């Protein structure tokens, strides 16, 4: 989801917009939703999307509010619609017109207080009246579709987001239309809940993280650098969300005591792992779920938020993760272990023997051609020693399809010291890989990986002496872009990473081992 690039719009520029959209493509995004709570972007935005092949989901500029349709206001809106439809309609990147952001849903439920999994007990945000409902129907289900049909008949009109097709017909039905899924995050459910849903299309979902330390330093004095300080909480769009980040963090990682920088790093891993958990699940179920748009791409000021790129253009861990989990050909793993246990804190004799541990690999292919790949996996311990070699299998995945491999039971795996490494190769080149734990990261017994690196030209070579999870490689200004970052590394492996932009000065690294 694309939001305004700056709170002061004249500070944006075509060059800045191009860079942002190029970075979206670099992370394998193929669609950008122009959010209805922002503004209609400049012509330059659409020109760049045409050039880069990005499909635009274009909201009309209405979000999260009711509008009273006086004759004068309706006349003003009609002029606005005519102007923007005529301006945008000729762009090859335009894929969809959407009437508004979340207004059908809010009207249907009578405000946030009455939405599912938001039992606040507060009164609705507004009292629905027949006139308000009539105004909604007239604007989004009569005026707008009629105007789009007259001025841009070849482009599809969708009445709202989320929606099941309009007419207040259960706009959040996961079996039809699109869904904004916020039970994870706003509803405080664990991110493992993503696997309980197979939506048709997820047009908005997200998970917050703090920006990097250099960005925090841009709006704080040293005495403000505590996430519960006045300044840090005011640089937070979502009320009390710094506390929410810490609640989720405590469910997943150990408490970071090594300083604010480590806490910020941990929050970014939390966000990235949560989104990976959801997207990979939906990609494995291609055919049922046909798309996911991450909330959000960018920020309009330096802030803790759902973005994958912060205000200054620094990539968070999520953006690097997106590059991997949105890759055209993806190998992913549906594991069973501690997170799948319906009662992981139950009294039992031995958690290792009483918990089912298994993996089931899946290759998803978003290209227009069949893809033949070789899949390999190993069960390894925290020293990267191979405990069980899964061998290799060659499979062909049809175009725009997925292929499941057989489930493998791993009763011998120690959930506190073992992990599975899996990789996908094509023509001898590794094109997708990751690792999976059977416990939450805070319970895994990491060994100091003794990370080291050297620079050769425009490349960095990173190595480890033990299994390293989510290796972060930053320069002094924390502003470079690498070909890969926040990756898993096995002992003895050398990871060669190209420097896309930025200087290799003051390189520092860490992994989940350092969250302590």
Could you tell me what each predicted segment is?
Residues 378, 382-418, 478-504:
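Intrinsically disordered, low-complexity Pro/Gly/Ser/Thr-rich segments with frequent PxxP/GP/PP motifs
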Residues 1, 32-34, 56-58, 99, ...:
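Hydrophobic faces of well-ordered beta-strands that scaffold small-molecule active sites
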Residues 51, 67-166, 270, 312-313:
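Active-site neighborhood of glycoside hydrolase catalytic domains
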Residues 1-65, 73-96, 233-272:
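Active-site-adjacent substrate/metal-binding segments within catalytic domains
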Residues 104, 139, 146-371, 389:
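Substrate-binding clefts and catalytic carboxylate motifs of secreted carbohydrate-active enzymes
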Residues 366-385, 464-481:
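Short acidic, flexible loop segments centered on an aromatic residue
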Residues 446-491, 495-500, 512:
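C-terminal accessory/binding modules appended to enzymatic or scaffolding proteins
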Residues 362-363, 403-449, 502-516:
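Terminal connector regions
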